[in-house]
Each structure stands twice: as structure tokens, then as C-alpha cells.
């Protein structure tokens, strides 16, 4: 369970106020770290505007003081202005590296001093690390050295660094641009096109060594590292959270209703909740995450109790995100009802199952269902290219025959890991709209290729120097093993596929029938379930047009029961093709439905069985007239004129009319 820390509470954070030693502004102690990280980048050494006549003006005229003097000045000013409050360095202990400035209200326009990277060396107690690695920009993460040096937020870091580079005229590699053109830090595209056959339609990432890429890919899954933090970076769901949608307006206004996010795996449900969480913390809203796979009812009650206390004492809202909410049973879901109704919590649930079947109707009526669709191939390519660029991998045009591995240049500005553009397109297609599968498949393919090259060099006795590593389409396919088939035996897709199979056979489309059968079996469906449905189809849709169809279906069921998968799949395929080609008749099916409709619509008690049709096993029954007047048909050579329906239903033909 993840709960936002107490430093996000505006009531508690106002108890201790400290003054920034650079810009002299007062602020809560919990926000001094993130403020100093930006303030030091925006103000050069000693360039904060002091009051008129201050002795600091003379010091600034003489030039910046050494780092030691600046450190002493911070301690002295903090001690003089806030004797009962710990210094900013001490107050930063125990804080996370989230970089959230909470209720901070100062803006960058209030500073008139030009930015300079020398501000990072002013006060060692609050260091500001710099890194030119493109991975931090693309992935929103800092390298290990930068993470150990400070706790500035990735977004503040990138904006300050971009402003510095723009004003200083320095490119992404730290070299001045002498030609006056903007250099995004990529290696020479023209030279790459000429030497390596690089695709002109792809962005050129900054060159990174293979070992750097390996270190970046180790640890957390790539899908988690690439998770966006803002709606602007959220790709592929414009229909649900596009610019003109109601939900987008509510999220940007921080008016978040109770939501049920419904969509296939990897479409962005958890990511959207992550974006809402980041935005909520900026507005001092408590955000709690639970997973229905391991949470219990007591965990939910504890969260609700805390939410009630937060609302009563601090007027603070609580958003509760339940991942895989369909895993909760009906009684567990009922726990949310009164608290969602009265506004104690705002519930956000994520599910891959149809909420109409898996979520209580009462709870569903109190939430807005947001349908997230499977990501299109174009969106998948965009997501994969963002990850590839952030890793410093270069995309090659596979239509050009030049092999980058054949070049022996060891120039450090050239990329060391390449991937074919065809491999990117194949990965986007095989992921089947699942961004998690695509990104993790890319991670696995790159790591496997780097590892295999290292093992080859070790076995051959060569020095391991992976200056040229190429990821091909086959590497991507091997990483995924097979196409990502979306199928859930207990979910909506189960019923969707069997319905499609039934309708394809009814329409005599043998190709489509085989496709839907294979999709179910390859997705892990029980073959006996399919065989039972075929037995039903034999009588419902074929009926008397081909009476042998029923025998075919029963034989297929018995065969599946005897031999099982995968051998029985051809038995089912034979039966499905036979049914698709067979003539169709619903005469029996329709007539029986007419009989059921007649019985259900009959007014009053049902008519009795005529006496001549009743059995008379005893003398008393015979004396009462049971069986009297019945004509035994085999005793007559001609058809017998005899009524077999109750008197009220005489003349009714269920094969020709729908109702009696």
C-alpha cells in the first residue's frame, strides 16, 4: 500500500518556515530542497538581489565567495533567522527524492539573474548534479551519480538544464556550437546515413556505449521506467483523455470523479492512475494504492478510516486506486459503497474484465466507466521509439545493405547499439496493443543480444568490445516467442470468441470459422468447452437439414475427451469445417421456442391432459375414464383421426406461427 507522506500536508508543513539563503524568500521547511535545486540553477554565485545598502552587495561586487564561505553563510543566516528551526540541510533528512514542491508559489519570472551552471557548486550541503545522459531526459530518471547527489525533481532538472544550454550556447555534449545551429546532442546524421545506412525518418539518439545501455536496462522493467508522468506524454488514448474530452478537463482542473478504468492489459490504466497520483500530490490530495490481488477487507477499512480522519481534521481529500478491482468479491466491493456515496473517498478502479459482469451494479452506478482501447500500431511505434531514443540506440534502415558491424571505427561519438526499423515495426505489431509487452520485449531483446555477444567474445578468446551490436527482427521475435494473444477464459473475450465462431459457422464461412477456433485454442481455451458448443450448434443451426451433424459433434467431443490437446485440435477443426459447409435449418429450434413462448404467455392454469391420452395402469383410473376412446395407431392401416393437443390448443401449428 502506497500512501503519500506527511510532508504533503499543507497544515503540517506550515508549522516550520525557513528562508531561502539565495533568494531570501520564506517557505515551508519541507519544500526547501526542491526550491534550492531550482533556485541555485537560476541564480549565479552571489547574484541574488539583496536589500539596498546591504553589506552583501559589496561582497557580490568582489566576485563569488569560495564554497566554504557560502556554506558558512547558509548556516549563519538560517541560525539567525530561525533559531528554533533546523537548517535546511537537516530538515531535508528523511525526505524522499520525489522533488515535489507541494504548495510552493514562487515563479521563475520573479528572478532576474541569468542562470549559470556554476550555481551547482555554491553550497555543498545542497548539491546539484549535472548529467548529459539522454536517458534521463527521455525516461524521466537520473543516473546513479545524479540521484546520489541531490533530490531535485526530473522535470525541474530538465527545464533548468535546457535553459542553461540555450543561453550558454552549449550543445548536449557540453561543446559549444560554433556554427550557430541547434545541436540536440545526436551524432552526425549525414555521416551516419553515408556509413551505416541510417533511416532518415527516425530520430537520431545520442550515442551511448553498450555497457551504459546494459546498466540502464538492468533493474526495473523498461515499461515501468518509461511510464509517463503527465497527460501530455500519455499516448494512444485520445478518445478517452484527448484535449477536448470531459475527463481531460476534469483531470486538469483536479476535479477527479470516481472512475472505473476498463481496458485490455498494457493499454495505460495504471499509467493514467500514476499521472493522477502525481497531479494529486501537487494539490495536497492524499493518494493511496491497493492491489486487489493481495489486499484484504481489513486493508480497505484501514484506508477508509484514515480517509475519514483526514477529511475531518484537515479537510483533505483521499483518492483510493484499486488495481485489478474485479478480483474483489461482491461483499468486498460493498465496503466502498457508503464512502463513495458520501465523498469520503474518490474511488479509481482498474480492470481488464467487463465491469458489467465483475463490478457490483450499485458501485458501478456511482462511478464513471472509462473505456481504454487497445493501443494502435502507430501509438506502439511512438512508444517504442521514445524508449529507443532514451536508451541511445540508433535505428537503421533495413532496406539499405550496409552492415554497421563491418565498420571498425572506434569513435566514441558513434552509437554502439543499433536496431533495424523493421524490428521496431515487427515488435509494435506483435505486441498487439500491449505497451508493457512491447517495452519489455525490447528490453529482453537488447539484453539478450548484448549478453550473447559478450559470451561469444569470451569463448573465442577475443576482447569484449561491443562497439557494434545490431538487434534484428529475428531477435525481437525470439524475445516475444510468439504473437501476444489476448484471451481470457473467464472474461469477456471468452464469450466474444465463441460468439464469433458460432456466427461464422452459421454464415458458412469456413475460413473465419477456423480462425476463431484457432484463436480460442491457442489462447488456452478448454477444448471440451468448444466441443460442447459444437454439439449444441449441430441441433440449433443445422438440425434436420443434415441429421448426421449431431453424430459428428458427439464424436468430436468424445475424441477430445480421449486424447486431449494438442492432438484433438484437428478433430475440432474437422467438425467446424463440416458444420460451416453443411446446409442449415432452424426449423426444430424455432418450433421449440414457439412452444416455450406459448406456455409462458398462457393466461390462467394450463389445460389438463385429455382423458383419452392418459395412462390407466389401475382399475380405478379406468373407471374414471383414463385412456377411454384412445385409438392405438398400429392397429389401423389408415391414418387415425385423433386429437393430441388440449381442446384449447386445437388447430395450433408451432412450426408455422410464433405464438398460440
Curated annotation (Swiss-Prot):
Residues 48-191 are annotated as: Disordered. CDD domains: AAA, HLD_clamp_RarA. Its main location: nucleus. Residues 76-89 have a biased composition (Polar residues). Its EC number is 3.6.1.-. InterPro entries: AAA+_ATPase, AAA_assoc_2, AAA_ATPase_RarA/MGS1/WRNIP1, ATPase_AAA_core, DNA_pol3_clamp-load_cplx_C, MgsA_C, P-loop_NTPase, Rad18_UBZ4. It comes from the Eukaryota. This is ATPase WRNIP1. It comes from Mus musculus (Mouse). The gene is Wrnip1.
Amino acid at each position: 500500500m502506497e500512501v503519500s507522506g506527511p510532508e504533503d500536508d499543507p497544515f503540517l508543513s506550515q508549522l516550520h518556515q525557513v528562508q531561502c539563503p539565495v533568494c531570501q524568500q520564506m517557505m515551508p521547511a519541507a519544500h526547501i530542497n526542491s526550491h534550492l535545486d531550482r533556485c541555485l540553477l537560476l541564480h549565479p554565485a552571489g547574484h541574488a538581489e539583496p536589500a539596498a545598502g546591504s553589506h552583501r552587495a559589496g561582497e557580490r561586487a568582489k566576485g563569488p565567495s569560495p564554497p566554504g564561505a557560502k556554506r558558512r553563510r547558509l548556516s549563519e543566516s538560517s541560525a539567525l533567522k530561525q533559531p528554533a528551526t533546523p537548517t535546511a540541510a537537516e530538515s531535508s533528512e528523511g525526505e524522499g527524492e520525489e522533488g515535489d514542491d507541494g504548495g510552493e508559489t514562487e515563479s521563475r519570472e520573479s528572478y532576474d539573474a541569468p542562470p549559470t551552471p556554476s550555481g551547482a557548486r555554491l553550497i555543498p550541503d545542497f548539491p546539484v548534479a549535472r548529467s548529459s545522459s539522454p536517458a534521463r531526459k527521455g525516461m524521466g530518471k537520473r543516473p546513479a551519480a545524479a540521484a546520489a547527489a541531490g533530490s531535485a525533481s526530473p522535470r525541474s532538472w530538465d527545464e533548468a538544464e535546457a535553459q542553461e544550454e540555450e543561453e550558454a550556447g552549449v550543445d548536449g555534449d557540453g561543446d559549444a556550437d560554433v556554427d550557430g545551429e541547434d545541436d540536440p546532442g545526436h551524432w552526425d546524421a549525414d555521416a551516419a546515413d553515408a556509413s551505416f545506412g541510417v533511416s532518415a525518418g527516425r530520430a537520431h539518439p545520442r550515442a551511448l556505449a553498450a555497457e551504459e545501455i546494459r546498466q540502464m536496462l538492468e533493474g526495473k522493467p523498461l515499461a515501468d521506467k518509461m511510464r509517463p508522468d503527465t497527460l501530455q506524454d500519455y499516448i494512444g488514448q485520445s478518445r478517452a483523455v484527448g484535449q477536448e474530452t470531459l475527463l481531460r478537463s476534469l483531470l486538469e482542473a483536479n476535479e477527479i470523479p470516481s472512475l472505473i478504468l476498463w481496458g485490455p492489459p498494457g493499454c495505460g490504466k495504471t499509467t493514467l492512475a500514476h499521472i493522477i497520483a502525481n497531479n494529486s500530490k501537487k494539490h495536497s490530495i492524499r493518494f493511496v494504492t491497493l492491489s486487489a490481488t493481495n489486499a484484504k477487507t481489513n486493508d480497505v477499512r484501514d484506508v477508509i478510516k484514515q480517509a475519514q480522519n483526514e477529511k475531518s481534521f484537515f479537510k483533505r481529500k483521499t483518492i483510493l486506486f484499486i488495481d485489478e478491482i474485479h478480483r474483489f468479491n461482491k461483499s468486498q466491493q460493498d465496503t466502498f459503497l457508503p464512502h463513495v456515496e458520501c465523498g469520503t473517498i474518490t474511488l479509481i478502479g482498474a480492470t481488464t474484465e467487463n465491469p458489467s459482469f465483475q463490478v457490483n451494479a450499485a458501485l458501478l452506478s456511482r462511478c464513471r466507466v472509462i473505456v481504454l482501447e487497445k493501443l494502435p500500431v502507430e501509438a506502439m511505434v511512438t512508444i517504442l521509439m521514445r524508449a529507443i531514443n532514451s536508451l541511445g540506440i540508433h535505428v537503421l534502415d533495413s532496406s539499405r545493405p550496409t552492415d554497421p558491424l563491418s565498420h571498425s571505427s572506434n569513435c566514441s561519438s558513434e552509437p554502439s547499439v543499433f536496431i533495424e526499423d523493421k524490428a521496431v515495426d515487427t515488435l509494435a505489431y506483435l505486441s498487439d496493443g500491449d505497451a508493457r509487452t512491447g517495452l519489455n520485449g525490447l528490453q529482453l531483446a537488447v539484453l539478450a543480444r548484448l549478453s550473447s555477444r559478450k559470451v561469444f567474445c569470451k569463448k573465442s578468446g577475443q576482447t569484449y568490445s561491443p562497439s557494434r551490436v545490431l538487434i534484428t527482427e529475428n531477435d525481437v521475435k525470439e524475445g516475444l516467442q510468439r504473437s501476444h494473444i489476448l484471451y481470457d477464459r473467464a472474461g469477456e473475450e471468452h464469450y466474444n470468441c465463441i460468439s464469433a465462431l458460432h456466427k461464422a459457422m452459421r454464415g458458412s464461412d469456413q475460413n473465419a470459422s477456423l480462425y476463431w477456433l484457432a484463436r480460442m485454442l491457442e489462447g488456452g481455451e478448454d477444448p471440451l468447452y468448444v466441443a460442447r458448443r459444437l454439439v449444441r450448434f449441430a441441433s440449433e443451426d443445422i438440425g434436420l437439414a443434415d441429421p448426421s451433424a449431431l453424430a459428428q459433434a458427439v464424436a468430436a467431443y468424445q475424441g477430445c475427451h480421449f486424447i486431449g490437446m494438442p492432438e484433438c485440435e484437428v478433430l475440432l477443426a474437422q467438425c467446424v469445417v463440416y458444420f460451416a459447409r453443411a446446409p442449415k435449418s432452424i426449423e426444430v429450434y424455432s418450433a421449440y421456442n414457439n412452444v416455450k413462448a406459448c406456455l409462458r404467455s398462457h393466461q390462467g392454469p394450463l389445460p389438463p391432459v385429455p382423458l383419452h391420452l392418459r395412462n390407466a395402469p389401475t382399475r380405478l383410473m379406468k373407471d374414471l375414464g383414463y385412456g377411454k376412446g384412445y385409438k392405438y395407431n398400429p392397429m389401423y392401416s389408415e391414418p387415425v383421426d385423433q386429437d393430441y393437443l388440449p381442446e384449447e390448443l386445437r388447430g395450433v401449428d408451432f412450426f408455422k406461427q410464433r405464438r398460440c
